[in-house]
Amino acid sequence: MNQEVMNLFNPQAPAQTFDSIRISIASPEKILSWSYGEIKKPETINYRTFKPERDGLFCARIFGPIKDYECLCGKYKRMKYKGIICEKCGVEVTLSRVRRERMGHIELAAPVAHIWFLKSLPSRIGTLLDMTLKDIERVLYFENYIVTEPGLTSLKEHQLLSEEEYMIAVDEFGEDQFTALIGAEAIYELLASMELEKIAADLRVDLAETTSDLKQKKLMKRLKIVENFLESGNRPEWMIMKIVPVIPPDLRPLVPLDGGRFATSDLNDLYRRVINRNNRLKRLIELRAPGIIIRNEKRMLQEAVDALFDNGRRGRVITGANKRPLKSLSDMLKGKQGRFRQNLLGKRVDYSGRSVIVTGPELKLHQCGLPKKMALELFKPFIYARLDAKGYSSTVKQAKKLVEKERPEVWDILDEVIREHPVLLNRAPTLHRLGIQAFEPTLIEGKAIQLHPLVCTAFNADFDGDQMAVHVPLSLEAQLEARVLMMSTNNILHPANGAPIIVPSQDMVLGLYYLSIVAEKEPGEGMIFADMGELQHALENKVVTLHTKIKGRFKTVDAEGNPVSKIYDTTPGRMIMGELLPKNVNVPFDICNQEMTKKNISKMIDHVYRHCGQKETVIFCDRIMQLGFAHACRAGISFGKDDMVIPESKAKIVAETEALTTEYEQQYNDGLITQGEKYNKVVDAWGKATDKITEEMMARLKAVEFDPVTGRQKQMNSVYMMSHSGARGSVNQMRQLGGMRGLMAKPSGEIIETPIISNFKEGLTVNEYFNSTHGARKGLADTALKTANSGYLTRRLVDVAQDAIISEVDCGAEIGLTMQPIVDAGQIVASIGQRVLGRTALDPILHPVTGEVIVEAGRMVEEKDVEIIEKAGIQSIRIRSALTCETRNGVCAKCYGRDLARGTPVNQGEAVGVIAAQSIGEPGTQLTMRTFHLGGTAQVVDSSYLEASYEGTVKLRNRNVVRNSDGNLVVMGRNMAVLILDATGKERAVHRVTYGSRLFVDEGDTVKRGQRIAEWDPYTRPIMTEVEGYVEFEDLVDGLSVSETADESTGITKRVVIDWRSTPRGSDLKPAMVIKDKAGKILKLSKGGDARFLLSVESILSVEPGAHVKAGDVIARLPMESAKTKDITGGLPRVAELFEARRPKDHAIIAEIDGTVRFGRDYKNKRRIIIEPNDDTIEPVEYLIPKGKPFHLQDGDVIEKGEYILDGNPAPHDILAIKGVEALASYLVNEIQEVYRLQGVLINDKHIEVIVRQMLQKVEITESGDTGYIPGDHVDRIELEEINERLIEEGKKPGSGNPVLLGITKASLQTPSFISAASFQETTRVLTEAAVAGKMDTLQGLKENVIVGRLIPAGTGGMANQIRRIATARDELIIDERRKTSGSAEANAMLVDMTDNAAE
């Protein structure tokens, strides 16, 4: 009853339902229609009465009453006068809430330009009028006149005239012969007189005629804006404002502070300036003031309105009284504190609390401990309701009193309320979806929340003072979702890689590891036990220890569920662990009959989950945790300083290394080696010494010692156990404690030559301590930067991928990606099985030997299939991928494959984009921030030999080899590869071999694993001859193109080609070597060209003129120094660079066509290379390559499409353009994975593919056809396909386009939803663009829906939307049916009527 009475007084308007939001430019009429009255005075409120001034910025007559149902003068009070307008003060009697909704307006005495359309680049007004921004500003800010109507004079339209020129023109032609205006009126006139249709038609004609690229772009931009205006129905002159809207006063409040001062919103100041200047201008115009004064006032009005809309966009920033810039309307929307991100995307939550967390080892996995005090506060409304229902209280007030007194019945009721009512726990920063999980609360004393130890990994929590927030899901639906989807027991697997995330860590691992140790010569060795009872008995009587080698019977079940048992060689500790394994035929005792390191425990849990299901796994994990803690406690493993053993041989190794460094010093002083070489050698020597000491130390720690008295094995070294089990600590940390700290880096990243010889146990000397401070400081600064950078990367990723949702089951795509194992330096880093697990096969996967089908096309690859695939040695598999999915909005379930967090095929409505973004962003903080400098470091980057990674037979692809004078096989081909085939003839490995490598094997040889196949010099690129003959030099003139340089240290001279273009005399030389026969004729090469070898700068000549050379002999070498010292961008910056699709600094140049290399005429300091195609229909392609870049092609070399002309990191755009989408995908996936793999982070490929899909959504129109697009437009790929299908049906000409790769920021800003783009970055620009085009946001993605406050169209929200759609459709059908039936009834009635009349 009370509810209904309340509603009478406070009618709640029903929430509006809508499907889309449109934004456009407001016309003056529109602004007037919003307004409730004009604001004429700058006053706000009367400082004595605190009542708003009439016609002022807070006027009650315009905006509504200040108190509910009370007019300003107090004549009408209460509900009964609702809607009456007081005749004394003119205020309507209504709710004060209308002061948040009603707008006012200011009539401007002179029009002003809207700064967004003027200054937001590209300037809309400028583009429309085809004038530069500078010129328009000159007119707007009253510096120049502009000719709007030249009449018959010699002036041109849009010509700018200064004051003097205007006067001269008036004198010359007379005032009425032409029109020239100044200020916003002039621009208004120009815009109002534009005939958009005619302009658009003219532009189209010009576009068709123009040939220059630049002009075309300019015309296209203008045409686009003209068309936007035509399509949206906006008028260009609306960009000039004659009326300014004023936002409701309660959105820019004025709050009295104590002491008679006021706190006010900046907007009030800005509006005041506008009103003041406007009123002054009106008065001046009435007084007929001189033009110059009026003009100045108009300019000031323009500036005041500019500041109101976007302060600081033009000219000086307007500051308030306290020298702080005023916050304009634009600033209200922009940035992290703006309306979008602060209030629409991030809202405060009611019913929440936060407290410190402590560990709760006796909790079950689905529980958390909630302090009673907190629970009482959080569940208050529920408690009040229950108290009322049970008759303890009749009013809310009484219930409140009971709760405040904390009466015993309140606690009982709290227990009831809490039972089965899950709460959400959240730990900031929430980097992925496992940062919020649901638990069932259990009440505890104290004030800290208890958290289950196994979920710490997911929350990344520890108990050193972390805090967590608790939220209460209120509605039944929310509770249901929390229980079914977010319960900690439902999140056992990691969404990023599908491995278990509920894995014991630290103490638990240590306990389990200790349980599983096997020791020699323990009491009771060799005993046999029939069941656990006997074993427990023996253990308690100390007949055996946990580590004794025994035989034991392990009981499990077979496939039918009958009990079976088997005897194993094991230890009592392992038997205890085996007891906890679920009884299942697929869970053998072997998985815990091994050393339980963290990796093995994880494997065990995964195995149990895959074979026994979720419930069993949860129970198993809880038990294993209890066991781990119990035994970690019993084992009493602790960290003592004597556990860190310093190896005896340390002093010896250090002395040896010091002797070596002294020797290098001496060699340097004698001039035998350079400074750089000495540095490298010293650093290398110390690096080796550190490693040696570490090895010795680890050997000492690992060593098993026996007690001489009892003969039993002593307990293993505690620290070694901690490290080896994976509980805590690494070899690196142990080395610093017990070995030597080793080499340190300078802040610049270079390595300091003198290492730190001491370790922490011995203590550092002052100098050593000082040297080690650099690295420590850098590490701290790094961490701070890393967090921010990683968060920003995640934000961009989420933004680009938020609308990738699973929207249908199967798109029927017949394209996909080819998966192959990833091999790095001969080692397989990702096997093909790992890569295809949980993906859908595109073609049937066949067994290479028997030909039987392992996986049918369209089926998902499961674990059992992976085993068969790995055994069969399949090397490449075609799979479906999100990248090639053809679903219109979103991705289909078949292309995506398995939902990694559930281990089942993905459900419809799953927001895979956001999950992908989180999976890539979450480990961001673990990546390094640094760029690796490979200048002074000790590692040599380039490997100089190739070893076989498999046994098999050698096959040479594109074989092109010769034997040189030493009798070695030398590779002469640019794109030759060594293949190793297995017995069945399948490729096991493919290795590219570089030009000039020496081969140790030939076609058909068999190789063993680890056998050398080829070697080459990593520091020089050879130039070799492929014909035998006599060398002759061309254009190698001493002093001009060749100089003899003597090596200072060794005194050996070498002849080097120098830059001959630096002197005017040498400008047209082409230094080369030619090979001639005895008669002096130039020999021909196999490809038909002359045997002439052009030499580049810095080549070292290896032969003298007239020397006799054999095929395969080196005639010149090109040192590769420049390539060696490049910085490798690693870690986070590299990932960001790849996702942003930036071109690397020195990027590779890739051949676009197959053909022959020719050298063209050189450019200033660039080399021109032309590729002449093999196919005559294609144009030759030219490339310009900077001189001095190491460059290995010769005139006449044959090159294939996709080969590198110049080495380096390729630009992703080039890969896409030349090799296509699949090559690009595999490049990006592999490059990104490499960065994460270095840090040991596992991420499934499909997440990266989802992001890359979002980057490849657009195509650039090349042929517009009848699509209505302009070449160069970016259009959605699928949209273009749909338009083309329609055009082909109508018999018109379809358009075509090339796929373009957009970086994630660009792609986010190009989403079809302007709301989503505006909330991401560059808010003003996005909104300006959207308003001009009159864009419609159909609210398809997640972000837009959050902003307008609807359920997101993913997950349960997606289902709700679907059900709603079905219901609406059904309603319409029912209504139609009713209409039909009622319609026929009416017709019958009319018939009856007519017959009656006829009868009368």
Curated annotation (Swiss-Prot):
Q: Does the keyword Translocase apply?
A: no
SMART domains in the record: RPOLA_N (SM00663)
Q: Which GO terms describe its cellular component?
A: DNA-directed RNA polymerase complex
- Zinc among the record's keywords? yes
Q: What is its EC number?
A: 2.7.7.6
One Pfam family recorded for the sequence: RNA_pol_Rpb1_4
What residues bind Zn(2+) 1, as annotated?
Answer: 71, 73, 86, 89
Q: Which cofactor does it need?
A: Mg(2+); Zn(2+)
UniProt keywords, alphabetically: DNA-directed RNA polymerase, Magnesium, Metal-binding, Nucleotidyltransferase, Transcription, Transferase, Zinc
| Coiled-coil positions | none
Which residues are recorded as binding Mg(2+)? 462, 464, 466
Query: Which GO molecular-function terms appear in the entry?
Result: DNA binding; DNA-directed RNA polymerase activity; magnesium ion binding; zinc ion binding
Residues annotated for Zn(2+) 2 binding in this entry = 811, 885, 892, 895
Briefly state the protein's biological role. DNA-dependent RNA polymerase catalyzes the transcription of DNA into RNA using the four ribonucleoside triphosphates as substrates.
Q: Which family does it belong to?
A: Belongs to the RNA polymerase beta' chain family.
Question: Per its UniProt record, what PANTHER family does this chain match?
Answer: DNA-DIRECTED RNA POLYMERASE, DNA-DIRECTED RNA POLYMERASE SUBUNIT BETA
Task: Provide the protein name.
Answer: DNA-directed RNA polymerase subunit beta'
